Design a protein with these regions (language model features):
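Flexible "arm" and connector segments at domain edges
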Residues: 1-52, 58-213
Protein backbone atom coordinates (compact mmCIF):
# COMPACT_ATOMS: atom_id res chain seq x y z
CA UNK A 1 0.00 0.00 0.00
CA UNK A 2 2.86 2.35 0.81
CA UNK A 3 4.46 1.54 -2.55
CA UNK A 4 1.22 2.35 -4.38
CA UNK A 5 1.04 5.71 -2.59
CA UNK A 6 4.64 6.44 -3.58
CA UNK A 7 3.85 5.60 -7.21
CA UNK A 8 0.83 7.93 -7.18
CA UNK A 9 2.92 10.77 -5.75
CA UNK A 10 5.64 10.24 -8.36
CA UNK A 11 3.18 10.03 -11.24
CA UNK A 12 1.51 13.25 -10.13
CA UNK A 13 4.85 14.98 -9.76
CA UNK A 14 6.47 13.82 -13.01
CA UNK A 15 3.66 13.08 -15.48
CA UNK A 16 2.64 16.25 -17.32
CA UNK A 17 -0.95 15.03 -17.78
CA UNK A 18 -1.42 13.88 -14.18
CA UNK A 19 0.20 17.01 -12.80
CA UNK A 20 -2.50 19.17 -14.40
CA UNK A 21 -5.41 17.14 -13.01
CA UNK A 22 -7.94 18.59 -10.57
CA UNK A 23 -10.36 16.83 -8.24
CA UNK A 24 -13.20 17.91 -10.54
CA UNK A 25 -11.51 16.28 -13.53
CA UNK A 26 -10.89 13.08 -11.57
CA UNK A 27 -14.48 12.76 -10.31
CA UNK A 28 -15.85 11.03 -13.46
CA UNK A 29 -13.06 8.45 -13.29
CA UNK A 30 -13.99 7.61 -9.70
CA UNK A 31 -17.61 7.16 -10.72
CA UNK A 32 -16.61 4.92 -13.62
CA UNK A 33 -14.21 2.79 -11.58
CA UNK A 34 -16.78 2.38 -8.79
CA UNK A 35 -19.30 1.14 -11.34
CA UNK A 36 -16.76 -1.39 -12.60
CA UNK A 37 -16.24 -2.68 -9.05
CA UNK A 38 -19.98 -3.28 -8.79
CA UNK A 39 -19.96 -5.03 -12.15
CA UNK A 40 -17.13 -7.32 -11.01
CA UNK A 41 -19.02 -8.16 -7.82
CA UNK A 42 -22.16 -8.98 -9.77
CA UNK A 43 -20.12 -11.14 -12.16
CA UNK A 44 -18.68 -13.07 -9.22
CA UNK A 45 -15.13 -12.78 -10.54
CA UNK A 46 -12.49 -12.52 -7.82
CA UNK A 47 -9.78 -11.66 -10.36
CA UNK A 48 -11.81 -8.83 -11.86
CA UNK A 49 -12.79 -7.57 -8.42
CA UNK A 50 -9.15 -7.50 -7.33
CA UNK A 51 -8.23 -5.45 -10.39
CA UNK A 52 -11.16 -3.04 -10.13
CA UNK A 53 -10.62 -2.43 -6.41
CA UNK A 54 -7.07 -1.51 -7.33
CA UNK A 55 -8.38 0.99 -9.87
CA UNK A 56 -10.62 2.59 -7.23
CA UNK A 57 -7.67 2.71 -4.83
CA UNK A 58 -5.65 4.46 -7.55
CA UNK A 59 -8.30 7.16 -7.77
CA UNK A 60 -8.13 7.64 -3.99
CA UNK A 61 -4.34 7.84 -4.07
CA UNK A 62 -4.30 10.20 -7.04
CA UNK A 63 -6.88 12.53 -5.45
CA UNK A 64 -4.75 12.61 -2.31
CA UNK A 65 -1.68 13.43 -4.42
CA UNK A 66 -3.56 16.27 -6.12
CA UNK A 67 -4.74 17.71 -2.80
CA UNK A 68 -2.67 20.51 -1.33
CA UNK A 69 -4.18 20.64 2.16
CA UNK A 70 -3.88 16.95 3.12
CA UNK A 71 -1.99 13.76 2.29
CA UNK A 72 -2.96 10.11 1.94
CA UNK A 73 -1.61 9.64 5.47
CA UNK A 74 -4.18 12.17 6.71
CA UNK A 75 -6.93 10.33 4.84
CA UNK A 76 -5.92 6.98 6.34
CA UNK A 77 -5.52 8.41 9.84
CA UNK A 78 -8.93 10.08 9.77
CA UNK A 79 -10.52 6.90 8.42
CA UNK A 80 -8.99 4.73 11.16
CA UNK A 81 -10.12 7.13 13.89
CA UNK A 82 -13.65 7.27 12.48
CA UNK A 83 -14.00 3.49 12.18
CA UNK A 84 -12.69 2.96 15.72
CA UNK A 85 -15.24 5.46 17.03
CA UNK A 86 -18.08 3.81 15.10
CA UNK A 87 -17.22 0.31 16.37
CA UNK A 88 -17.30 0.74 20.17
CA UNK A 89 -18.27 -2.93 20.51
CA UNK A 90 -14.88 -3.81 19.00
CA UNK A 91 -12.57 -1.12 20.36
CA UNK A 92 -14.37 0.00 23.54
CA UNK A 93 -16.60 -1.47 26.21
CA UNK A 94 -19.91 -1.66 24.34
CA UNK A 95 -21.61 -4.99 23.65
CA UNK A 96 -23.33 -5.88 20.40
CA UNK A 97 -24.73 -9.38 20.05
CA UNK A 98 -26.88 -8.68 17.00
CA UNK A 99 -26.44 -6.83 13.69
CA UNK A 100 -29.28 -4.52 14.73
CA UNK A 101 -27.34 -3.42 17.82
CA UNK A 102 -24.26 -2.80 15.68
CA UNK A 103 -26.31 -0.48 13.47
CA UNK A 104 -27.66 1.34 16.54
CA UNK A 105 -24.13 1.95 17.82
CA UNK A 106 -22.96 3.02 14.37
CA UNK A 107 -25.80 5.53 13.98
CA UNK A 108 -25.27 6.90 17.50
CA UNK A 109 -21.56 7.43 16.85
CA UNK A 110 -22.26 9.00 13.48
CA UNK A 111 -24.81 11.39 15.00
CA UNK A 112 -22.25 12.42 17.60
CA UNK A 113 -19.73 13.18 14.84
CA UNK A 114 -22.24 15.20 12.82
CA UNK A 115 -23.66 17.41 15.57
CA UNK A 116 -23.55 20.47 13.30
CA UNK A 117 -26.07 18.88 10.95
CA UNK A 118 -29.60 20.25 11.30
CA UNK A 119 -31.41 17.66 9.17
CA UNK A 120 -31.31 13.90 8.70
CA UNK A 121 -30.89 14.72 5.02
CA UNK A 122 -27.62 16.56 5.56
CA UNK A 123 -24.82 14.51 4.06
CA UNK A 124 -27.00 12.53 1.67
CA UNK A 125 -25.22 12.80 -1.71
CA UNK A 126 -27.75 14.15 -4.19
CA UNK A 127 -25.64 12.87 -7.08
CA UNK A 128 -26.53 9.25 -6.31
CA UNK A 129 -28.47 7.34 -8.99
CA UNK A 130 -32.18 8.01 -8.54
CA UNK A 131 -33.15 4.53 -7.36
CA UNK A 132 -30.34 4.38 -4.79
CA UNK A 133 -31.16 7.92 -3.70
CA UNK A 134 -34.84 7.04 -3.32
CA UNK A 135 -34.01 4.07 -1.10
CA UNK A 136 -31.68 6.22 1.01
CA UNK A 137 -34.25 9.00 1.34
CA UNK A 138 -37.02 6.62 2.37
CA UNK A 139 -34.76 5.32 5.14
CA UNK A 140 -34.07 8.87 6.30
CA UNK A 141 -37.80 9.59 6.24
CA UNK A 142 -38.49 6.68 8.56
CA UNK A 143 -36.19 8.27 11.15
CA UNK A 144 -38.56 11.25 11.47
CA UNK A 145 -41.84 9.43 10.99
CA UNK A 146 -42.33 10.10 7.30
CA UNK A 147 -43.32 6.78 5.78
CA UNK A 148 -44.27 5.81 2.27
CA UNK A 149 -45.38 2.30 1.38
CA UNK A 150 -44.95 0.80 -2.03
CA UNK A 151 -48.68 0.03 -2.22
CA UNK A 152 -49.62 3.63 -1.40
CA UNK A 153 -47.32 4.99 -4.09
CA UNK A 154 -48.68 2.59 -6.70
CA UNK A 155 -52.24 3.54 -5.72
CA UNK A 156 -51.33 7.21 -6.07
CA UNK A 157 -50.64 6.79 -9.79
CA UNK A 158 -53.56 4.35 -10.24
CA UNK A 159 -51.40 1.55 -11.55
CA UNK A 160 -53.09 -0.94 -9.21
CA UNK A 161 -56.82 -0.66 -8.56
CA UNK A 162 -57.58 -4.05 -7.03
CA UNK A 163 -58.75 -4.31 -3.42
CA UNK A 164 -56.16 -6.93 -2.50
CA UNK A 165 -52.98 -5.15 -3.59
CA UNK A 166 -50.58 -7.27 -1.55
CA UNK A 167 -50.64 -10.29 -3.86
CA UNK A 168 -49.84 -8.05 -6.84
CA UNK A 169 -46.63 -6.76 -5.30
CA UNK A 170 -43.21 -8.14 -6.31
CA UNK A 171 -42.34 -11.24 -4.29
CA UNK A 172 -38.58 -11.15 -4.90
CA UNK A 173 -35.78 -8.88 -6.08
CA UNK A 174 -36.13 -10.46 -9.52
CA UNK A 175 -39.83 -9.59 -9.59
CA UNK A 176 -39.01 -6.09 -8.39
CA UNK A 177 -36.54 -5.73 -11.25
CA UNK A 178 -39.25 -6.75 -13.71
CA UNK A 179 -41.65 -4.21 -12.19
CA UNK A 180 -39.09 -1.40 -12.29
CA UNK A 181 -38.15 -2.21 -15.88
CA UNK A 182 -41.84 -2.24 -16.77
CA UNK A 183 -42.32 1.20 -15.24
CA UNK A 184 -39.31 2.52 -17.15
CA UNK A 185 -40.76 1.04 -20.36
CA UNK A 186 -44.08 2.73 -19.57
CA UNK A 187 -42.30 6.05 -19.06
CA UNK A 188 -40.45 5.65 -22.35
CA UNK A 189 -43.66 4.80 -24.23
CA UNK A 190 -45.35 7.93 -22.90
CA UNK A 191 -42.38 10.19 -23.51
CA UNK A 192 -41.55 10.64 -19.83
CA UNK A 193 -38.09 10.80 -18.28
CA UNK A 194 -38.07 8.11 -15.57
CA UNK A 195 -34.93 9.48 -13.88
CA UNK A 196 -36.32 13.02 -13.79
CA UNK A 197 -39.71 11.77 -12.58
CA UNK A 198 -38.21 9.88 -9.65
CA UNK A 199 -35.88 12.73 -8.74
CA UNK A 200 -38.86 15.08 -8.72
CA UNK A 201 -40.72 12.78 -6.33
CA UNK A 202 -37.59 12.51 -4.18
CA UNK A 203 -37.44 16.31 -3.92
CA UNK A 204 -41.06 16.31 -2.75
CA UNK A 205 -40.19 13.61 -0.20
CA UNK A 206 -37.26 15.70 1.01
CA UNK A 207 -39.64 18.61 1.62
CA UNK A 208 -41.94 16.30 3.61
CA UNK A 209 -39.02 15.08 5.73
CA UNK A 210 -37.74 18.58 6.46
CA UNK A 211 -41.25 19.67 7.42
CA UNK A 212 -41.52 16.74 9.84
CA UNK A 213 -38.23 17.50 11.63
Amino acid sequence: LLRAAEVADQVHAECVWSRALTHEQLAPYLTEESAEVIEAIEAGSADELREELGDVLWQVLLNAAVAESFTIDDVASDLAAKMIHRHPHVFAGETAETPERVIELWNAAKSEEKRSRTSVLDGVPKGMPALALAQKMLGKGEQVGVGLSYVEEIRAVEVIEAEDDEELLPASEEDLGETLLGLVALARARGWDAERALRGRIRALADEIRSAE
